[in-house]
Amino acid sequence: GQSISDNGKWVACKMEPWEGDAVVNLYDAQGKELATFPRADRFLFSASSDYLVVSQKPGKMIVDSLKIKKTKKDKLPMDALVIYSLLGDREVIDSLKTFKLAEKVDWVAFQKGRKDSTLYVQPLNANLSTRYEAPAVKAFNFAEKSGMLYYITAGDKAEEKPGLYLLNTETGVKTLIKEGDGVFKQVTFDEDGANLAFLYCAQKNSCYKAMSLWLSQQGAPATEVVARGNQALPKGWVISEHGKLQFSKSASRLFFGTSPEPRQKDTLQLAENRPNVQVWSWDEPVQYTVQDYNKE
């Protein structure tokens, strides 16, 4: 694969051999090679075109040798994240679990370590001291056209309450949009990050029937806009936890999915008391009794 920076001055190409590790090479507009990144996986130019962000996998030969030695999965080496400045400087973040790069600002959010669920948010410019951290984060993402970031956290006992937060990376303002340790799904920004919609259910085992739609506007705490039993929903219908939330282009409309309330398995009925129906065709070449015997 290949990628061209937005200003057209830089090109990154990924070379993948039939067997072994991939390499990302960085070139200028004249075709001069500027840098090489071995064991490369994902690679992205920043919004300003001043940085190239590359995630690196552990070497395949190293991982294979460790697997042969029956090394436990949690003892295998982890990925790394390289933040390369087109001026030549680079920062390496080890033990990478996952990362998201903002599309319109030079910021990155990531988690590292297998047992550490802390979210780290920082500018790509290593000379800037601004850093943010959030504990026990389950999910996070940037808005498409701004530096707004949401994250869902289980919280901690000290400062952070459980719930959905909104972080403005440009101002440093953090807002608790919805407090709760229930289930958040389909968290969705509009393009500019001014509005944030999501589904929420307080009880995990009731998500199939009790999801409600929430909306935060201009960074304000979210309010519930549609819930089970709303007059707009047909009788017996619920907000679907699988439906995709989507704002219109102007963000004046919000689309969400509905469905008849799903039927759930009766867990109070013993298996031997449930009807056992067998279905087969009259013209099958092998009789059902023989099929049943062969299956056993």
What is each model feature region?
Residues 1-296:
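Beta-propeller folds
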